[in-house]
């Protein structure tokens, strides 16, 4: 056996015996390092005659290549073994009982729960859920909704505007979920015109909205839900019935008295604010009884300008819409004193006010059972 064959055999045995990456690195340095055994062999090529170099060069370089390949294979094998050992060590037995702790149980956030409750109620009435982008254009957020030029909501101190683009146009974080109404009406109008299929619109729109406001009852990011009905026969009586049914179901009372007060919103005409009967004498508000009134939402008939901007003839179609703050009605229903706590990610708070994951709201089983 030649010296090169003996050296190769020894190095390959050392590689096979290496039990971890530090050991394989030590073998590499001993063989291919600056003073390694293979490196020393390579250095001798410089002192050989051309004939000797031609004979010995391929053998020595072949040795180097085989050692390098063996080192790479062993290193890969060791890494796979390490990963397999770690997976085995950290394996979780999913059949074990869950540890009873706040972190392991988990809770559904009240906002998510209330959104599920609201959508369950309106789904039972035949409404579908619609969504839209949080970043909107001035047109969809204001102009198409009949906000006049110079309206306070268009000012920088009320609305989060982005920097203008190269065309001088500014986008913004939507200040309400109402732009989704326009998007939806445009889509339905396009289907009507293209396919000659005139379907009524019945949608409910939950989502995040943004305004420059922050205190115990206001947040710069908050949640709204609104609804829209557009049909040839939609009227105020329909709207009143829908809202009464919603309030009874949401607050889980057999009956509720509603008071409708004239108001003003740019996108509805007439516009109304709705109060419901309640008792505020105790620590928590009780709905469906008492002598107090509490404002709960705003609503109205869709303004003709909004219908027109969305592709509907106001002489043929009517619509009604309503909207409310999800955070606020969650606070009212479940007795939460400070809106800011909704966004603090405090595990103790969510443990107290949160809901079990299997508390899925249904009208049959009770929304907050």
Curated annotation (Swiss-Prot):
InterPro entries, per database record: aa-tRNA-synth_II, aa-tRNA-synth_II/BPL/LPL, Phe-tRNA-synth_IIc_asu, Phe-tRNA_ligase_II_N, Phe_tRNA_ligase_alpha1_bac, Phenylalanyl-tRNA_Synthase, tRNA-bd_arm
Cofactor annotation remark: Binds 2 magnesium ions per tetramer.
Reactions that this protein is recorded to catalyse: tRNA(Phe) + L-phenylalanine + ATP = L-phenylalanyl-tRNA(Phe) + AMP + diphosphate + H(+)
Domain of life per record: Bacteria
Subcellular location(s) per record: Cytoplasm
Any Gene Ontology CC annotation: cytoplasm
Pfam families to which the protein is assigned, alphabetical: Phe_tRNA-synt_N, tRNA-synt_2d
GO molecular function: ATP binding; magnesium ion binding; phenylalanine-tRNA ligase activity; tRNA binding
Major subcellular location class: cytoplasm
Cofactor: Mg(2+)
Key words of the record: Aminoacyl-tRNA synthetase, ATP-binding, Cytoplasm, Ligase, Magnesium, Metal-binding, Nucleotide-binding, Protein biosynthesis
Top-level enzyme category: ligase
Family: Belongs to the class-II aminoacyl-tRNA synthetase family. Phe-tRNA synthetase alpha subunit type 1 subfamily.
HAMAP family named in the record: Phe_tRNA_synth_alpha1
Assembly information from the UniProt record: Tetramer of two alpha and two beta subunits.
Protein name: Phenylalanine--tRNA ligase alpha subunit
Organism classification: Bacteria, Pseudomonadati, Pseudomonadota, Alphaproteobacteria, Hyphomicrobiales
């Amino acid at each position: 056996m030649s010296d090169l064959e003996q050296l190769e055999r020894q190095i390959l045995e050392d590689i096979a015996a290496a039990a971890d990456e530090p050991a394989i690195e030590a073998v590499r340095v001993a063989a291919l390092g600056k003073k390694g055994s293979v490196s020393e062999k390579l250095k001798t090529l410089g002192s050989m005659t051309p004939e000797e170099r031609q004979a010995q060069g391929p053998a020595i370089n072949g040795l180097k290549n085989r050692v390098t390949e063996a080192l790479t294979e062993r290193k890969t094998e060791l890494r796979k073994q390490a990963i397999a050992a770690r997976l085995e060590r950290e394996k979780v037995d999913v059949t074990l009982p869950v540890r009873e702790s706040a972190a392991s149980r988990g809770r559904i956030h009240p906002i998510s729960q209330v959104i599920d409750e609201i959508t369950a109620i309106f789904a039972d009435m035949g409404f579908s859920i619609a969504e839209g982008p949080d970043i909107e254009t001035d047109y969809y957020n204001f102009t198409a909704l009949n906000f006049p030029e110079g309206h306070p909501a268009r000012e920088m101190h009320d609305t989060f505007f982005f920097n203008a683009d190269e065309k001088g146009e500014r986008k913004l974080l939507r200040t309400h979920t109402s732009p989704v109404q326009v998007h939806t009406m445009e889509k339905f109008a396009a289907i009507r015109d293209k396919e000659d299929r005139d379907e009524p619109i019945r949608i409910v729109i939950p989502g995040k909205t943004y305004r420059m406001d922050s205190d115990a009852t206001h947040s710069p990011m908050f949640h709204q839900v609104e609804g829209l009905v557009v049909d040839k026969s939609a009227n105020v009586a329909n709207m009143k019935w829908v809202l009464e049914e919603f309030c009874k179901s949401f607050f889980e009372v057999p009956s509720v008295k509603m008071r409708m007060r004239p108001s003003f919103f740019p996108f509805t005409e007439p516009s109304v604010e709705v109060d419901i009967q309640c008792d505020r004498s105790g620590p928590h508000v009780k709905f469906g009884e008492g002598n107090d009134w509490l404002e709960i939402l705003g609503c109205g008939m869709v303004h003709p300008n909004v219908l027109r901007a969305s592709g509907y003839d106001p002489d043929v179609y009517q619509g009604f819409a309503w909207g409310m703050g999800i955070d606020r009605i969650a606070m009212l229903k479940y007795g939460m004193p400070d809106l800011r706590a909704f966004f603090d990610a405090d595990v103790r708070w969510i443990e107290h006010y949160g809901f079990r994951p299997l508390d899925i709201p249904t009208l049959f089983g009770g929304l907050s059972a």
